Amino acid sequence: MTSEQFEYHLTGKEILEKEFKTGLRGYNPEDVDEFLDMVIKDYSTFTQEIEALQAENIRLVQELDNAPVRTAPQPAPTFQAAAQPAGTTNFDILKRLSNLEKHVFGNKLDDND
């Protein structure tokens, strides 16, 4: 149920500022009765809305209680080669490879050119 389904006649300010006309014997009873009828209708409307919202709240809480628990997806682990120290770049690897080749093959590489 939405609040559009309920019709409100008075605001708190209107109730506070309401002045009744007085007749010879006090307030005009018809004015007082009309005003009190509107107050009663509003209280009835508020009561209905409160009951509807409480019922909806109970329903939603039960829905939550019965819903399966979902966890946030875990990020996929990133692969990092164990042989590479942190911060090693391709340039560093190529430089190390070049030094290794020079050490293993020595001058043989220069002779083939």
From Swiss-Prot:
This protein's UniProt keywords: Cell cycle, Cell division, Cell shape, Coiled coil, Cytoplasm
One cellular component term from this protein's GO annotations in UniProt: cytoplasm
Compartments it resides in: Cytoplasm
Pfam families with a match to the protein in the record: DivIVA (PF05103)
Gene3D superfamilies in UniProt: 6.10.250.660
InterPro entries on file: Cell_cycle_GpsB, DivIVA_domain, DivIVA_fam
Coiled-coil residue windows: 36-68
GO annotation (BP), single: cell division
Superkingdom, natural source: Bacteria
Keyword Hydrolase: no
Task performed by this protein: Divisome component that associates with the complex late in its assembly, after the Z-ring is formed, and is dependent on DivIC and PBP2B for its recruitment to the divisome. Together with EzrA, is a key component of the system that regulates PBP1 localization during cell cycle progression. Its main role could be the removal of PBP1 from the cell pole after pole maturation is completed. Also contributes to the recruitment of PBP1 to the division complex. Not essential for septum formation.
Binding partners and assembly: Forms polymers through the coiled coil domains. Interacts with PBP1, MreC and EzrA.
Family of the protein in this entry: Belongs to the GpsB family.
Protein name: Cell cycle protein GpsB
Native organism: Listeria welshimeri serovar 6b (strain ATCC 35897 / DSM 20650 / CCUG 15529 / CIP 8149 / NCTC 11857 / SLCC 5334 / V8)
Phylogenetic lineage: Bacteria, Bacillati, Bacillota, Bacilli, Bacillales
Gene: gpsB
